């Protein structure tokens, strides 16, 4: 929004031209989201406490989690508000990338909100029925996938980038829709499964978003893209604003979500942030790279799939409890140890993912 005001003011003073630089607006976007989260966080937590919107803890969960019962949840509203305000202020509202991301965050955030509302307000422990949650996620993801495929302006927008192989970038054609769908829905649910300990999901989300900010910037510049053998995607630089807004909002939320948490993000936060990471990966053509950098999310998801599959096929469980972070809790690891070690794994995987841009 302010891009247009700055463009007008440039007529009177060339100093306003600095707002045309994506990097400058990205920094302002990060700071805006961070400051908003830190400032409004206590107010939201107080409001949630007054409304008695507290976390529901399963009786069959780890005993250490019983103390979390009643902790304010739906804090993802704070994250979404910070991102929306930041992007609307500093993003180029004429960019297709910006509106796609706002739609993703809004639609998946709404699905998560309905789920949380049913759990904590209507006291329905099951929340939104799993079937309906998946249907709504699928509708939103398919709408995004079809839109991106129909509006692709150059061949690079529907290529598949394969890490470590600089000349392997096959054209996907209509298969793009299928890949985009599974990436968005899968990422959304993976982050949701990871969000089981204080700060466990938000920090890897921040790390992956920061990495995608760099990738989006490189993809938007022809020279960098050609040098790294990745698709040149004109205009993708605007995704940097979205990514840094996620980073700022995430760090601000972590201030209150770190152990022992004062607030949880709830499904309204985890489903929307996961879908956002998946959509960014689709937009910059780095779906495989998301699997690497988001390895913690993948590990959590696979642990659930393996646990359920093993129990149904063999009648035996592989882990003491799934997702896998609960397994380590039941082994006696203190919660902060599980969290920090998963963060360390995430740092390693993000750096490995970034290294693949050059190791081709």
Curated annotation (Swiss-Prot):
One GO cellular component this record assigns the protein to is: plasma membrane
List the EC numbers from the record.
2.7.8.13
Task: Report TM segments.
Answer: 26-46, 74-94, 97-117, 134-154, 168-188, 199-219, 236-256, 263-283, 288-308, 338-358
Task: Tell me its cofactors.
Answer: Mg(2+)
Protein location: Cell inner membrane
Cross-referenced InterPro entries, in alphabetical order? Glycosyl_transferase_4, PNAcMuramoyl-5peptid_Trfase, PNAcMuramoyl-5peptid_Trfase_CS
Which domain of life does the protein's organism represent? Bacteria
Q: Which reaction does it catalyse?
A: UDP-N-acetyl-alpha-D-muramoyl-L-alanyl-gamma-D-glutamyl-meso-2,6-diaminopimeloyl-D-alanyl-D-alanine + di-trans,octa-cis-undecaprenyl phosphate = di-trans,octa-cis-undecaprenyl diphospho-N-acetyl-alpha-D-muramoyl-L-alanyl-D-glutamyl-meso-2,6-diaminopimeloyl-D-alanyl-D-alanine + UMP
Q: In which pathway does it act?
A: Cell wall biogenesis; peptidoglycan biosynthesis
Briefly, what is this protein's role?
Answer: Catalyzes the initial step of the lipid cycle reactions in the biosynthesis of the cell wall peptidoglycan: transfers peptidoglycan precursor phospho-MurNAc-pentapeptide from UDP-MurNAc-pentapeptide onto the lipid carrier undecaprenyl phosphate, yielding undecaprenyl-pyrophosphoryl-MurNAc-pentapeptide, known as lipid I.
Report the source organism.
Shewanella baltica (strain OS155 / ATCC BAA-1091)
User: What Gene Ontology biological process does one annotation of this record name?
Assistant: cell wall organization
- A Pfam family annotated for this UniProt entry: MraY_sig1
What gene name is given for the protein in this entry?
Answer: mraY
Family as reported in the entry's similarity comment = Belongs to the glycosyltransferase 4 family. MraY subfamily.
Q: What protein is this chain from?
A: Phospho-N-acetylmuramoyl-pentapeptide-transferase
